[in-house]
Amino acid sequence: MKKLVFALLLTVMVAFASAAQTREIYTNNNFRTLAQSHKMLAIMPFAVKLQLRPKEVEKNGGAEGVAKLEEREGLDVQQALHSYFLKQKESNDLTVEVQDPARTNALLAQAGLTASQLATKTPEQLAQLLGVDGIISGSFSSTQPMSNGAAVAMNLVVGMSAPTNTGKLVINIHDGKAGELLWKYDKSLSRGFGSDTNTIVTTIMRKASRQFPYSKEFKG
């Protein structure tokens, strides 16, 4: 009897965890139609908001220093995502190319666009400027920078046993022609140690690999 109860409880917990993971990810019902001709995507520098304590703000050079740190963090996430996609491409598990961030950022700079000004442009405008078919953008908010070693671990946040969140990473993909949101991944993060930006981004993306629409594993 106890074994039966345990088995039923385990089944419910697995189902709950799966449902929680699904809620974190949105895929446009018309994805295949909108993205069927996509060949190249570009990753924007991420918008980062660090909610640091007063002493940490002072340690990082005040508000101006924190702003510079946030900008660096945004570039780190951009680069980490690109590195992840390169590995997927090498494994023959990615159906599109991803523009080198160096080219992306150079074109943005030539157009006079700083990271803080990206939100003033539509996905269509950015795609035309960069010569790509889709735009990957997003945001990261946390009480700790990802790149300083006091990192954030990637524990799945589910139900009653959920750990205290210390941040959130949101990844969006928009179509470059219609501007429609094609895919969104909204991931809460929990406190941990020993991880850097690449490790965090890779772990997060692996959790969503089968639901990433440009992956050959995608069944949607």
What are the residue ranges of the model-derived segments?
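Bacterial N-terminal signal peptides
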Residues: 7-15
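Sec/Tat signal peptide C-region and signal peptidase I cleavage site
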Residues: 16-20
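N-terminal segment of the mature soluble domain
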Residues: 47-137, 176-187, 207, 211
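Charged helix-capping and loop-helix junction motifs
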Residues: 120, 153-156
